[in-house]
């Protein structure tokens, strides 16, 4: 709950604006990491949720990885100081330039949406003399009957 002093101060600020409760964010991140650690899970923050550098810094300091779905998100995570190996790059329509940047940065993994994308990443990685770790999304065409 916000104090009267805070709400009075907020009344003086032009809108719209964002107000982040960094203490709550830190507590939530600690809780997520503590629970994930009990099972050996790795937690990645969806950068698309909010790529404000102050948020990304807190997320990085808490030990989470970065889940990115665009080249700009990969760049934001790298510039925020995430360990490149903790950056995962998913999403469709990755450009050659975005793939090159991700490879040069040394990201942990590409999530590939198709065999064609896998071939493009392989070609670019080969040309750059890099190794690309990938996860390939497979659609087994099974009706889950849901």
Listing of model-derived features with the role each one plays in the protein:
Residues 134-139:
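ATP-grasp fold ATP-binding core
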Residues 1-126, 130-132:
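A charged N-terminal "starter" segment
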Residues 140-146:
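Active-site loop/helix belt of alpha/beta enzymes
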């Amino acid at each position: 709950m916000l104090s009267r002093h805070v709400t009075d101060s907020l009344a003086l600020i032009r809108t719209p604006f964002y107000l982040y409760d960094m203490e709550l964010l830190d507590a939530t991140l600690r809780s997520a990491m503590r629970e994930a650690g009990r099972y050996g899970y790795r937690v990645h923050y969806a950068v698309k949720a909010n790529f404000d550098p102050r948020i990304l810094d807190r997320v990085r300091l808490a030990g989470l990885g970065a889940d990115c779905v665009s080249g700009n998100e990969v760049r934001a995570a790298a510039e925020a100081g995430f360990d490149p190996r903790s950056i995962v790059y998913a999403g469709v329509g990755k450009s050659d330039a975005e793939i090159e940047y991700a490879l040069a940065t040394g990201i942990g993994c590409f999530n590939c949406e198709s065999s064609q994308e896998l071939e493009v990443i392989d070609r670019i990685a080969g040309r750059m003399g890099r190794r690309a770790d990938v996860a390939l999304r497979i659609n087994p065409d099974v009706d889950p009957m849901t």
